[in-house]
Swiss-Prot record:
Name of this chain's protein: Protein transport protein SEC39
Keyword Protein transport recorded: yes
Entry keyword set: Endoplasmic reticulum, ER-Golgi transport, Membrane, Protein transport, Transport
Miscellaneous note of the record: Cells with a reduced level of SEC39 show a defect in post-translational processing of PRC1/CPY.
Primary residence: endoplasmic reticulum
Protein's job: Required for protein transport between the Golgi and the endoplasmic reticulum. May contribute to tethering of coatomer-coated retrograde transport vesicles to the ER membrane through interaction with and stabilization of the SNARE complex.
Gene: SEC39
Length: 709
């Protein structure tokens, strides 16, 4: 009966976290284990652990203030007198009390999985696990108890559990913002355990670094669970360490040194670690060269490899040894910052085309690194481009092929200063192959230009390429050099005007002018001038400018105009006449028309005939021209006279089948002129009566010429 009452009181005080009263029962339950089990299970999980510090002193028996022993009955009476609410629970009938007693015992035993707690250490471990089930985010909740425990109260096994399980788990939960319970963590398979520890390590930001994860999570976990070899086999491999990022590389390095320290007394595990390092570098070294501080990383890796026995091999490929890896690393440091260990070995065995592809790839990548061109070129001059040495890597590529490849890459990068320096260094002036390469890129830049202005980036590149040709390839270029120079000049001049030469697939024009459009007009260069006159309304008055442009187009496109200069000029002037009429400028059209007839007449009958056959319609339109701005839409008298003059000249050269229509228009004008009152001519341009004799005289002369014709 007393045993049951004391047990129930202990359960009540434990559930109330009543430190003062529970301490009075520490030696009253028959065994210390019962007392510890009650406190372990029933003490509120959320209560401050400091309230349980008294358990560290369980070895000392609780004495009465006077030092006299008290009986169990006295303790029960004292406790009930201090709290009368306990009486119904404790002084109930025997059956009820006994049932409560057994039910509580069964509950506590089940909660502890039938474990018996013999001492403070066992109690503390189970208490930590029980509280962790309710408060899993704080596995170190009871740290105050183990940190303040007296020496030798807690075993090294328990301390190892704290250091190898609780502390790493607490660190991981905080880092990942996850909650793993202690029981869950301890039962987790190794592969999943390793994966969780390294989850997000490569993306970490803030105060926690890679070293913290290794030092505070991984190393204690591996050491406590004796999982070093398992980790090396299952996790420290080429799949996990691609070396594609600086973080992955740093993780690889820091982890290696941690593992090396962990297995230093285990030769088999140490050799396995070294083999895995060689395997990782052999398969993933190509990714190193995308990382920052490459020189430092190569030195770091060389330091690691140099400490390996030469005979260390890769399990999957026994022919690759640590000795070969050291030799490859030496080549890396001196010559290359691109190829992987596997590729270096393969390159030496490949044919010419494959070696050239690798060489070009190497140069392209190195040249594209900021501020690396000059230093890399110097390194190349000292190694694979040193004419005094044999190239031991790219053994099947000639010097010309190497330089051609380098120049092509530099042209793509627009590094013209380096291009010129290489041509001068290796005396490649007027080299046919290099000249053809330069011309190829001239056209590449020219065709990609968005406009023809010299300041346009692609046009500037084309100009710089041409300058190199002018300086170093003039003999090889010959007359082609002048044509390219003129083409750039014409492109620049055309771009200062409104112009649209870009033809779409359906024949319509797009909006933008590109210099390459000029090349589409080789068979019809005059169409370019026509487009200019159409889009630049004032240009029809500037014949010298369009003439210069047209002849420049002929020269740049290598169009032969020998013996055709006069006809080309006449065609251009007639085009100007058309656009003068479009712009309602009869005066300019008339003056140009007179010049055309004079030029053709001086050139001979064949030019006159060609003029009539090809351009009679333009002059006929002059004879029919009406300016809507004229008074009453009537042709001024002076203009009628000039139109009759032009039509009279046209009758001399127009095709026979067109004579009737030209004569008809001339007659219409003559009839209109005869109907004018030349004394009071309100349609005269100057409104003066003395025009009568002048206009009449010209009219009679024209009439006489037509009659004779």
């Amino acid at each position: 009966m007393l045993e049951e009452q004391l047990y129930l009181l202990a359960c009540i005080f434990a559930s109330r976290a009543d430190t003062r009263n529970i301490k009075k029962l520490s030696t009253r339950l028959g065994s210390q284990s019962k007392y510890l089990e009650i406190l372990c299970v029933l003490w509120p999980e959320l209560d401050d652990p400091k309230n349980l510090l008294f358990l560290r002193e369980l070895e000392e028996e609780v004495q009465s203030p006077e030092g006299e022993e008290t009986t169990d009955e006295d303790v029960i009476v004292e406790l009930l007198e201090s709290d009368s609410s306990l009486i119904p629970l404790i002084e109930s009938d025997t059956t009820t009390r006994s049932n409560r007693y057994h039910e509580l015992q069964e509950f506590i035993s089940k909660k502890l999985n039938n474990k018996t707690l013999e001492n403070f250490e066992e109690w503390l471990r189970e208490r930590i696990l029980i509280c962790n089930e309710m408060i899993p985010e704080t596995p170190l909740l009871y740290s105050v108890l183990w940190e303040t425990a007296k020496s030798k109260v807690l075993s090294t096994k328990f301390i190892g559990w704290v250091e190898g399980v609780l502390k790493p788990l607490d660190h991981l939960n905080k880092r990942l913002h996850l909650i793993f319970k202690i029981n869950e963590w301890e039962k987790m398979p190794d592969s999943e355990l390793f994966k969780i520890i390294f989850d997000g390590v490569e993306d970490m930001q803030g105060y926690i670094g890679i070293a913290d994860v290794i030092e505070d999570e991984l190393a204690p976990t591996l050491s406590y669970g004796k999982k070093w070899e398992t980790f090396i086999t299952e996790f420290f491999n080429k799949q996990q360490f691609s070396l594609k990022s600086d973080t992955n590389y740093q993780l690889f390095i820091k982890l290696y040194y941690s593992l090396e320290k962990g297995v230093k007394d285990n030769s088999e595990a140490s050799r396995k670690l070294q083999s895995n390092v060689v395997d990782i570098l052999f398969h993933n070294s190509e990714n190193l060269f995308n990382l920052s501080s490459l020189t430092h990383k190569l030195d770091e890796l060389w330091s690691i490899l140099s400490g390996f026995p030469d005979e260390i091999t890769i399990e999957e490929q026994k022919t690759i040894t640590a000795l070969e890896m050291k030799q490859f690393m030496e080549f890396f440091i001196k010559c290359s910052t691109k190829f992987s260990f596997k590729e270096i070995f393969a390159i030496t065995q490949e044919e010419e085309s494959a070696q050239l592809a690798h060489f070009s790839s190497l140069c392209h990548e190195e040249f594209n690194k900021a501020n690396e061109i000059s230093s890399f070129l110097q390194a190349m001059y000292e190694t694979v481009l040193d004419i005094s040495k044999d190239d031991k890597i790219f053994t099947r590529i000639s010097m010309d092929e190497k330089l051609y490849s380098i120049l092509e890459i530099l042209l793509q990068m627009n590094e013209f200063a380096y291009i010129e320096a290489i041509i001068e260094r290796f005396d490649y002036s007027n080299n046919t192959q290099i000249y053809e390469l330069l011309v190829k890129f001239f056209w590449h830049f020219f065709n990609n230009a968005s406009n023809g202005l010299r300041k346009e980036p692609e046009m500037k590149k084309a100009s710089q390429t041409l300058q190199i040709i002018q300086k170093h390839m003039s003999q090889r270029a010959g007359t082609n050099l002048t044509k390219l120079e003129v083409l750039l000049e014409i492109s620049d001049k055309l771009s200062h005007y409104s112009i649209n030469l870009n033809k779409s697939h359906n024949g319509a024009r797009d909006t933008a002018f590109k210099p390459s459009n000029i090349l589409e007009y080789r068979d019809c260069p005059l169409d370019i001038i026509s487009n200019l006159l159409e889009l630049n309304p004032r240009l029809y008055k500037d014949l010298p400018t369009t003439k210069s442009l047209l002849f420049g187009i002929y020269d740049s496109l290598s169009i032969n105009r020998e013996g055709q200069t006069g006809k080309v000029e006449v065609d251009l002037m007639v085009l100007h006449i058309d656009y003068a009429l479009v712009n309602l400028d009869f005066g300019t059209a008339y003056e140009l028309g007179k010049q055309v007839f004079e030029i053709c007449q001086e050139a001979g009958q064949h030019m006159m005939k060609a003029l009539g056959d090809e351009h009679w319609l333009t002059f006929y339109q002059m004879g029919k021209f009406v300016d809507p701005n004229w008074v009453d839409n009537e042709i001024p008298t002076e203009i009628i006279v000039l139109q009759m003059s032009i039509l009279g000249r046209l009758l001399e050269v127009c095709p026979l089948e067109e004579v009737e229509i030209v004569t008809s228009q001339w007659s219409t004008l003559e009839l209109e002129l005869s109907a004018r009152d030349l004394v009071k001519d309100k349609y005269a341009l100057d409104g003066q009566n003395d025009n009568k004799s002048k206009v009449g005289g010209i009219a009679r002369e024209i009439f006489h010429n037509v009659t004779n014709f």
